[in-house]
């Protein structure tokens, strides 16, 4: 599958990273197109730019952010994603299309105690035929 991350998307990610003082996320060349793992830890971000979800070769995504409210709807573009970890106490919802992440093998959801629609989330998860491990710690 062709990667859809454009120069404009790279600039958006760079501006976002600069705004939050995240130097490790700087994107200067096309090496990011082959990025396999992305970890976003201990930041004060409230949203993640949709451009990150155009890195279609991503296989592992880990997000640990206290202030994150929601993930972009473009998350369903990560069709090669095998592992998804999220620990975001203030997240309010997951985007539509988690069932489109057909290669997911592991889902780890912890401390997402916001206004999650658990019924909707589970409805998408049960459609994931490759899922081998599911960890939910939701109050």
Show the residue positions of the predicted features:
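Low-complexity intrinsically disordered segments
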Residues: 3, 9, 40, 53, ...
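Concave beta-strand-loop units of leucine-rich repeat
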Residues: 39-44, 62-68, 85-91, 108-120, ...
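The feature encodes a structural signal of leucine-rich repeats
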Residues: 25-26, 48-51, 71-74, 94-97, ...
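Generic detector of contiguous secondary-structure segments
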Residues: 1, 88-99
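LRR N-terminal entry segment and analogous cap-like coil->beta motifs
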Residues: 2-65
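Leucine-rich repeat
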Residues: 32-33, 54-58, 65, 77-81, ...
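A short, hydrophobic secondary-structure junction motif
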Residues: 38-39, 48, 125-133
């Amino acid at each position: 599958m062709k990667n859809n991350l454009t120069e404009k998307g790279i600039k958006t990610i760079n501006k976002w990273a600069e705004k939050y003082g995240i130097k490790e996320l700087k994107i200067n060349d096309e090496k990011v197109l082959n990025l396999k793992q992305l970890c976003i830890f201990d930041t004060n971000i409230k949203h993640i730019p949709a451009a990150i979800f155009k890195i279609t070769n991503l296989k592992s995504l880990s997000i640990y952010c206290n202030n994150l409210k929601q993930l972009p709807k473009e998350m369903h573009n990560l069709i090669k994603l095998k592992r998804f970890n999220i620990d975001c106490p203030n997240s309010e919802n997951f985007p539509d299309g988690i069932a489109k992440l057909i290669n997911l093998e592991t889902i780890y959801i912890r401390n997402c105690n916001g206004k999650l629609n658990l019924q909707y989330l589970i409805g998408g998860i049960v459609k994931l035929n490759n899922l081998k491990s599911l960890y939910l710690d939701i109050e």
